[in-house]
């Protein structure tokens, strides 16, 4: 069990976890639906959006660009207004805003804080400059002189982030553009973008990751599905400690982190997938080798699973060091503190499973590190202390409340 949610969280070992939880709304879908609502030709309703620090940053951004927001209803402006967009620590907000700012006549400045000011933007800046957009800077803050992107075709290097491709696809939906995405990582996120575009009536033809987008965005009543990334922590708890059912998960959703289902089976867990739920039950854990390049947000919780699997697991990914933290380093530091044998690789970790002990979590101000280590702590000998549990608000504000609820059911 654990102490109260406040400045500090204390998690203690539990004998078993048995319960159910409803997956929160998807962060990825919420971001995309907000920005397409901003650019649509008529009002939209975004139903069941995620309310978190990152999605609030996107909601504030579309308001700055001129959208009227009234509850779930979003009324697009007749003309976008330029301004200062504070993306806070949301990479998706910053990158889509940068592309949208190219449509707003006048100067917009995209800012942020924390690790976001260190994260890459140059490939997106280069793509926009190829459309004759005047941009100052290649890291935040970035100034954009918007109003009239010119061109019919653009290449964007997506080897560092699929968000560059998403940003250009959303821009293309307004002006009509063929977008060729080169070497995309996290490819399922592109599929999510295209799925949301379809819901807003956007027509396109694609050949792999070359997409010809026709201009025209219709207002939509968009229902945000559940988030596999947030659900992954509870699914992992079921695999490690008992049995957990997570509802509000759509079967065959293109979300990158839906891969958690297959990976849990590889680890040895018993998994049952229903039309709108997933049940995971404990079994003997086996080590695995997995490349997280297409689903980097699963890396922390997969490392936790590997910590309990007898033998050596290898978990890698192309851009793990470029997230909210250097996740390779962040996970390695915490697992070593828990007494787990870890070898740091250039793009991932070798982890030898063992018996974790309680420790004080170093969050690196990364929501997914905190949530993953909370799950680790449920099976560790002794107390696991989280000094800044509030960082989960970036993506899953109710995480600890949901965790408490699941533990109380068992």
From Swiss-Prot:
Signal peptide: none annotated. It catalyses: 3-phosphoshikimate + phosphoenolpyruvate = 5-O-(1-carboxyvinyl)-3-phosphoshikimate + phosphate. Phosphoenolpyruvate binds at residues 27, 91, 119, 163, 327, 368, 394. Its EC number is 2.5.1.19. 3-phosphoshikimate binds at residues 27-28, 32, 161-163, 297, 319, 323. It is found in: Cytoplasm. NCBIfam families: aroA. InterPro entries: Enolpyruvate_Tfrase_dom, Enolpyruvate_Tfrase_sf, EPSP_synthase, EPSP_synthase_CS, RNA3'P_cycl/enolpyr_Trfase_a/b. The active site is at 297 (proton acceptor). Pathway: Metabolic intermediate biosynthesis; chorismate biosynthesis. Pfam families: EPSP_synthase (PF00275). Monomer. GO terms for molecular function: 3-phosphoshikimate 1-carboxyvinyltransferase activity. One of its GO terms (cellular component) is cytoplasm. One of its GO terms (biological process) is aromatic amino acid family biosynthetic process. This is 3-phosphoshikimate 1-carboxyvinyltransferase. Belongs to the EPSP synthase family. Catalyzes the transfer of the enolpyruvyl moiety of phosphoenolpyruvate (PEP) to the 5-hydroxyl of shikimate-3-phosphate (S3P) to produce enolpyruvyl shikimate-3-phosphate and inorganic phosphate. The keyword DNA damage does not apply. Keywords: Amino-acid biosynthesis, Aromatic amino acid biosynthesis, Cytoplasm, Transferase.
């Amino acid at each position: 069990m654990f102490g109260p949610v406040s400045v500090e969280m204390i998690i203690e070992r539990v004998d078993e976890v048995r319960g159910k939880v409803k997956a929160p709304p998807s962060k990825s879908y919420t971001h995309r639906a907000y920005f397409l609502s901003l650019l649509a030709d008529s009002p939209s309703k975004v139903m069941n959006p995620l309310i978190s620090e990152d999605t609030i940053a996107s909601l504030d951004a579309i308001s700055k660009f001129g959208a009227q927001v009234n509850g779930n209803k979003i009324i697009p402006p007749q003309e976008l207004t330029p301004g200062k967009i504070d993306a806070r620590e949301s990479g998706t907000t910053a990158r889509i805003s940068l592309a949208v700012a190219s449509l707003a006549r006048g100067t917009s400045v995209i800012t942020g804080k924390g690790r976001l000011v260190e994260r890459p933007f140059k490939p997106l800046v280069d793509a926009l400059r190829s459309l004759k957009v005047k941009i100052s800077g290649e890291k935040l803050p970035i100034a954009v002189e918007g109003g009239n992107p010119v061109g019919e075709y653009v290449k964007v290097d997506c080897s560092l982030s699929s968000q560059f491709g998403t940003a250009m696809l959303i821009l293309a939906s307004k002006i009509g553009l063929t977008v060729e995405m080169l070497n995309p990582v996290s490819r399922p996120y592109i599929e999510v973008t295209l799925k949301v575009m379809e819901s807003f009536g956007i027509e396109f033809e694609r050949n792999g990751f070359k997409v010809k987008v026709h201009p025209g965005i219709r207002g939509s009543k968009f229902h945000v599905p559940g988030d596999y990334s947030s659900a992954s922590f509870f699914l992992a708890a079921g695999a490690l400690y008992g049995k957990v059912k997570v509802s509000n998960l759509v079967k065959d959703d293109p979300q990158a982190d839906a891969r958690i289902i297959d990976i849990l089976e590889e680890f040895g867990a018993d998994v049952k997938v229903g039309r709108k739920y997933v049940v995971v039950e404990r079994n003997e854990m086996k080590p695995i080798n997995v490349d997280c390049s297409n689903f980097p947000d699963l890396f922390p919780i997969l490392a936790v699973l590997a910590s309990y699997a007898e033998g050596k697991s290898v978990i890698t990914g192309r851009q793990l060091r470029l997230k909210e933290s250097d996740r390779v380093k962040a996970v390695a530091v915490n697992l070593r503190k828990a007494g787990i044998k870890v070898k740091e690789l250039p793009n991932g970790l070798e982890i030898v499973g063992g018996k974790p002990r309680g420790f004080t979590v170093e969050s690196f101000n990364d929501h997914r590190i905190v949530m993953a280590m909370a799950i680790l702590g449920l099976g560790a000998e002794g107390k696991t202390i989280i000094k800044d549990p509030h960082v989960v608000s970036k993506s899953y504000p109710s995480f600890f409340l949901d965790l408490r609820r699941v533990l109380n059911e068992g």
